Regions:
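Extended boundary segments
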Residues: 1-49, 120-122
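Short alpha-helix capping/helix-loop boundary micro-motifs
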Residues: 62-69
Length: 124
C-alpha cells in the first residue's frame, strides 16, 4: 500500500489536474521525491500574466513539448509548478492563484504557508 503524500496543511495531498495531466510523476498530483530537482509541488491555477512572467523568467510553460509529455499551458489550467519559480513570482508581484490542499508540504521549504494562503482559492 502506498503512503499518501501530505499537503502544506498536513492533510492528504489532493489531485491537482488530470486535464492536462500534471505532476512530477504525471499522476495528476503534485507528488515529489528526491529526483524532482525542480520541486514541482505548487498546484497553481495559472493565468496569462503568470505564464508570460514565467516565460520571461526563463521557464516557458506556454509552448508544448510532447517529447516530455508537456502539452503547453493556457489561462485557467491547473499545473504543478516549481516551488522556487512560484516563490519568485510572488516576490515579483506576478503570482497566480494556488490550491493549498493540492500543494505538497515540501513547498514549505521554499515558501511560507502565510504567503501561500494569500493566493489560496480553496480555503474558506
Amino acid at each position: 500500500m502506498t503512503v499518501k503524500q501530505k499537503n502544506v496543511l498536513g492533510e492528504d495531498l489532493e489531485e491537482c489536474s488530470v486535464d492536462p495531466v500534471t505532476g512530477w510523476y504525471r499522476d495528476g498530483c503534485c507528488n515529489t521525491d528526491n529526483n524532482d530537482l525542480g520541486v514541482h509541488t505548487v498546484c497553481a491555477k495559472v493565468n496569462n500574466e503568470f505564464l508570460e512572467w514565467c516565460k520571461q523568467d526563463g521557464n516557458d510553460l506556454i509552448t508544448p513539448h510532447p517529447e516530455y509529455g508537456f502539452p503547453g499551458l493556457k489561462d485557467g489550467d491547473n499545473w504543478c509548478v516549481c516551488a522556487s519559480s512560484y516563490a519568485r513570482s510572488v516576490d515579483a508581484g506576478k503570482a497566480c492563484s494556488v490550491y493549498v490542499k493540492r500543494t505538497h508540504e515540501k513547498t514549505l521549504t521554499l515558501i511560507s504557508i502565510d504567503k501561500l494562503k494569500k493566493f489560496a482559492i480553496d480555503l474558506s
